[in-house]
């Protein structure tokens, strides 16, 4: 069964490694090389100190046909398109990766001791499905601009701002790569220029040698002509003097021309040294620009990370604010409901208190009225007792006499009725019977009232036990008790009125005494009921006061808590404002740094363009000067005739001057090395400053973490932060505007770089064409030089032969006059002419 394939290719800004082809049959571990696992082309193990041993995992999900990457608690982090997967050394959720993504393992780490930077692994990944088709690209995905985790999509999806920053960083990296290629091209062009200069020097030397040979031939021809002529000593002397004068004039002209050539050569060397210096300066500036670009990229990444962190913090704060607002609303609603309930309870208790006070006053008035009536009744009862005693004493005897008669038959009654007895006595007897019946009825009523009172007392005791229940039940029980008390008070009054009527109708002493006793008992019970009602009223008043005090205490405590919360909210507002000011200052400082860096980049670009233009002008001027020098040399060929010894002396002096120039160049090289050492020292100082800035950054980050902890602790107690959200949203909009301006500036810079690159490429093409032309010219000159050397050798051989012949002739002439002398001179002249004419023909073109 075929398996999915992942190809890791090295980026220019990465630690170097070979291209890896990894088959994803199972989850593949990405990490640092160890003794057991060495880097190979079919694994994801890298020889890099920045990576962890178990840095990350890559696998292919056959169900979803997607590729996933997970950071397994690495120390320096894993990045997908400049977005870190996890915070700190935490395990990240699996994140989807697409073909063409740029994956970074770790970050660049510098050692303080050796001051060596260890690069990280940056690679572009190409993903192929098991069927051989390439996975979808990042540009094909519309909804998700960056890879999202499986579980937490919203938490790890970066914003469009970070994606644009990543694109800008990619453009800058490509521009740096192009600059490196241009620098390499410039270096090759410089080498070609050096080669052409050497070739031109050799060609000049060949031309000088050719002119030298021609001058020798002319001299030899003149000598042959002079020897062939039969002249006297005076004429020979004159010719020798003229020849010596010509020789001196030629020497002076040659010396002047050589001086001019030397001066021009010195100027050319000086210009070349200046060009080399400008080249070194431009290279230094390019390195500085690269470093500044890297720093700006790092700062942009840090700003992007900070921006994403601030966005996440804002989201967390908004969520917490919403939760806090909901809790606050719930608490406020609960407080308002409790407040309303307490107010209603207080109002009800006050109303009940007023009602109870009114009832107490009414009961007191009724009690006073009943006391007055009871006193009046007591007086009447005393009068009635006296009357009844008198009547009972008179009637007691008559009743005893007539009892057997009453118990007798009806016949006796009939007889009595028929007899004309005393009617008044019978009426009195009947009235006594009625009174006895009334007394029995009264006793029954009294017993029933006693039973009802006992039941009421038991009910009151149960009600008193229930008074410890809530205030609503107390108030209802109190009202029922008051009603029962009123009924109890009204009942004895009614009974007293009935008893009055009965006592008025009845005049028995025993019944009156019993009624009086019952009335006294009822009065005592009524007084006790009044006392208990008063005690209940006092208890209710005490409970009301206690509840009022408790409510007041609760209100005071709530007011204090509200004040404390308001103070804490004010403190939180102040802290948030301070943090916002610090963030604004940091953002403004970073903006200033970016602007200054951009200005420096523009200045350096202008300087580089000026240097390139100066190089072009210098190159053109050098070419023109070379043409002039060639023309002058051609003129010197025709006019100059030199001797070998003088030329050798001039060559020696020229060599001495060259050695002096070389010594000067060495001194300049030593001076440049000293300047390099100074620059290295300055670089060390800058590195120390960078380390100090990093330490300050670490301290600032720790302070930020501490402030974040304080914010987290204060967020638990805060409930109102809506104003801060609006301010943060305004700052976010400002940041987005500034980011847009930065993007426009970066795009402009990229366009300028592209134009400069196109110009440089055109210049390189022109230089290549000129180089090809110079190569063709050099090849022709080399051929001519070889031909001239061959001719030179032949001529030197012939000249040696001629010299030998001349020496022999002179010796013979000194010894004997030789008759074949003119013939021999003519022969030598003819041979010289034959040899000289083709040389002139070759030299003339």
UniProtKB/Swiss-Prot annotation:
Coiled-coil region(s): 167-202, 231-388, 506-816
Domain of life of the organism encoding this protein: Eukaryota
UniProt main location, coarse: membrane
Keyword flag Isomerase: no
Tissue specificity field: Expressed in proliferating myoblasts and differentiated myotubes (at protein level). Expressed in myoblasts, cardiac and skeletal muscles.
Domain FHA positions: 28-85
Topology feature Cytoplasmic, residues: 1-819
Region described as Disordered: 451-484
Regions of this protein lying in the Extracellular compartment: 841-845
Membrane-topology descriptor: Single-pass type IV membrane protein
Annotated keywords: Cell membrane, Coiled coil, Cytoplasm, Cytoskeleton, Endoplasmic reticulum, Membrane, Mitochondrion, Phosphoprotein, Transmembrane, Transmembrane helix
Renumbered residue ranges of the record's region Necessary for targeting to centrosomes: 1-163
Molecular function via GO: protein-macromolecule adaptor activity
Extent of Basic and acidic residues compositional bias: 451-463
One CC-aspect GO term: membrane
PROSITE patterns registered for this protein in UniProt: FHA_DOMAIN
Positions where Phosphoserine occurs in the chain: 148, 465, 469
GO biological process: negative regulation of hippo signaling
Annotated transmembrane regions: 820-840
Localization terms from the record: Cell membrane, Sarcolemma; Cytoplasm, Myofibril, Sarcomere, M line; Cytoplasm, Myofibril, Sarcomere, Z line
Subunit organization: Homodimer. Interacts with myosin. Interacts with SIKE1 and both associate with the STRIPAK core complex composed of PP2A catalytic and scaffolding subunits, the striatins (PP2A regulatory subunits), the striatin-associated proteins MOB4, STRIP1 and STRIP2, PDCD10 and members of the STE20 kinases, such as STK24 and STK26. Interacts (via FHA domain) with STK3 (when phosphorylated); the interaction associates STK3 with the STRIPAK complex.
UniProt record similarity statement: Belongs to the SLMAP family.
Domains (record comment): Alternative spliced transmembrane domains determine subcellular targeting. Isoforms 1, 2, 3 and 4 are targeted to endoplasmic reticulum membrane as well as mitochondrion membrane. Isoform 5 is not targeted to mitochondrion membrane but to endoplasmic reticulum membrane.
Function of the protein: Associates with the striatin-interacting phosphatase and kinase (STRIPAK) core complex, forming the extended (SIKE1:SLMAP)STRIPAK complex. The (SIKE1:SLMAP)STRIPAK complex dephosphorylates STK3 leading to the inhibition of Hippo signaling and the control of cell growth. May play a role during myoblast fusion.
Name of the protein described by the UniProt record: Sarcolemmal membrane-associated protein
Annotated organism of origin: Mus musculus
Lineage: Eukaryota, Metazoa, Chordata, Craniata, Vertebrata
């Amino acid at each position: 069964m075929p398996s999915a394939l992942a190809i890791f290719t090295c980026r220019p800004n990465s630690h170097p490694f070979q291209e890896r082809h990894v088959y994803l049959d199972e989850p593949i571990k990405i990490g640092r090389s160890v003794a057991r696992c060495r880097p190979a082309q079919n694994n994801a193990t890298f020889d890099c100190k920045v990576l962890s041993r178990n840095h990350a995992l890559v696998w292919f999900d056959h169900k979803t046909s997607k590729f996933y990457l997970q950071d397994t608690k690495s120390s320096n982090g894993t990045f997908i398109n400049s977005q870190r997967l996890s915070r700190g050394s935490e395990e990240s959720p699996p994140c989807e990766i697409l073909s063409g993504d740029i994956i970074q393992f770790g970050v660049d780490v510098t050692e303080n001791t050796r001051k060596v930077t260890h690069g990280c692994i940056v690679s572009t990944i190409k993903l192929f499905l098991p069927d051989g088709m390439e996975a979808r690209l990042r540009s094909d995905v519309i909804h998700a601009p960056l890879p999202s985790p499986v579980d937490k999509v919203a938490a790890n999806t970066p914003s469009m701002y970070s994606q644009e920053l990543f694109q800008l960083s990619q453009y800058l990296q490509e521009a740096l790569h192009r600059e490196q290629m241009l620098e390499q091209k410039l270096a090759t062009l410089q080498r070609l220029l050096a080669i052409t200069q050497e070739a031109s020097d050799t060609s000049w030397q060949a031309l000088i040698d050719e002119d030298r040979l021609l001058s020798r031939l002319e001299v030899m021809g003149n000598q042959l002509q002079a020897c062939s002529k039969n002249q006297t000593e005076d004429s020979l002397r004159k010719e020798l003097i003229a020849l010596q004068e010509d020789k001196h004039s030629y020497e002076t002209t040659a010396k002047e021309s050589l001086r001019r050539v030397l001066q021009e050569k010195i100027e050319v060397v000086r210009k070349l040294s200046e060009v080399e210096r400008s080249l070194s300066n431009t290279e230094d500036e390019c390195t500085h620009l690269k470093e500044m670009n890297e720093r700006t990229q790092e700062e942009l990444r840090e700003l992007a990370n900070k921006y994403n962190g601030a966005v996440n913090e804002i989201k967390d704060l908004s969520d917490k604010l919403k939760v806090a607002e909901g809790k606050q609303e719930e608490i406020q609603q609960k407080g308002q409901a409790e407040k309303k309930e307490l107010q209603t309870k207080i109002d009800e208790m006050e109303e009940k208190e007023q009602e109870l006070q009114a009832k107490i006053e009414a009961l007191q008035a009724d009690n006073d009225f009943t006391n007055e009536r009871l006193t009046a009744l007591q007086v009447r009862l005393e009068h009635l007792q006296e009357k009844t005693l008198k009547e009972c004493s008179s009637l007691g005897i008559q009743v005893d006499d007539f009892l057997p008669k009453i118990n007798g038959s009806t016949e006796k009654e009939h007889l009595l009725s028929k007899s004309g007895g005393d009617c008044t006595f019978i009426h009195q007897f009947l009235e006594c019977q009625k009174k006895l019946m009334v007394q029995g009825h009264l006793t029954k009523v009294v017993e029933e009232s006693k039973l009802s009172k006992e039941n009421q007392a038991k009910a009151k005791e149960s009600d008193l036990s229930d008074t410890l229940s809530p205030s609503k039940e107390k108030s209802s029980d109190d009202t029922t008790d008051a009603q029962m008390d009123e009924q109890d008070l009204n009942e004895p009054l009614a009974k007293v009125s009935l008893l009055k009527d009965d006592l008025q109708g009845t005049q028995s002493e025993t019944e009156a005494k019993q009624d009086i006793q019952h009335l006294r008992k009822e009065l005592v019970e009524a007084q006790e009921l009044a006392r208990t009602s008063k005690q209940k009223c006092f208890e209710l008043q005490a409970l009301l006061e206690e509840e009022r005090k408790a409510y007041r205490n609760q209100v005071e405590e709530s007011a204090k808590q509200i004040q404390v919360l308001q103070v804490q909210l004010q403190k939180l507002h102040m802290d948030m404002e301070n943090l916002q000011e610090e963030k604004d200052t940091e953002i403004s400082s970073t903006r200033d740094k970016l602007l200054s860096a951009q200005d420096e980049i523009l200045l350096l670009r202008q300087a580089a363009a000026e240097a390139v233009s100066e190089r072009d002008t210098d190159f053109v001027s050098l070419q023109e000067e070379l043409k002039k020098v060639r023309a002058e040399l051609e003129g010197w060929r025709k006019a100059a005739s030199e001797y070998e010894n003088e030329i050798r002396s001039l060559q020696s002096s020229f060599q001495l001057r060259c050695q002096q120039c070389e010594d000067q160049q060495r001194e300049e090289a030593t001076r440049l090395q000293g300047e390099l050492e100074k620059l290295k020292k300055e670089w060390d100082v800058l590195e120390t400053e960078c380390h100090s800035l990093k330490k300050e950054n670490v301290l600032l980050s720790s302070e930020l973490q501490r402030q974040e902890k304080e914010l987290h602790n204060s967020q638990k107690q805060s409930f109102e932060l809506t104003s801060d959200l609006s301010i943060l949203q305004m700052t976010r909009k400002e940041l987005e505007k500034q980011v847009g301006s930065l993007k426009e500036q970066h795009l402009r810079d990229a366009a300028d770089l592209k134009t400069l690159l196109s110009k440089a490429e055109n210049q390189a093409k022109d230089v290549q064409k000129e180089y090809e032309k110079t190569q063709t010219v050099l090849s022709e000159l080399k051929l001519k030089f070889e031909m001239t050397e061959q001719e030179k050798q032949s001529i030197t051989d012939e000249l040696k032969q001629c010299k030998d012949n001349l020496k022999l002739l002179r010796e013979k002439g000194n010894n004997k006059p030789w008759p074949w002398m003119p013939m021999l001179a003519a022969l030598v002249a003819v041979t010289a002419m034959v040899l000289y004419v083709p040389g002139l023909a070759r030299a003339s073109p």
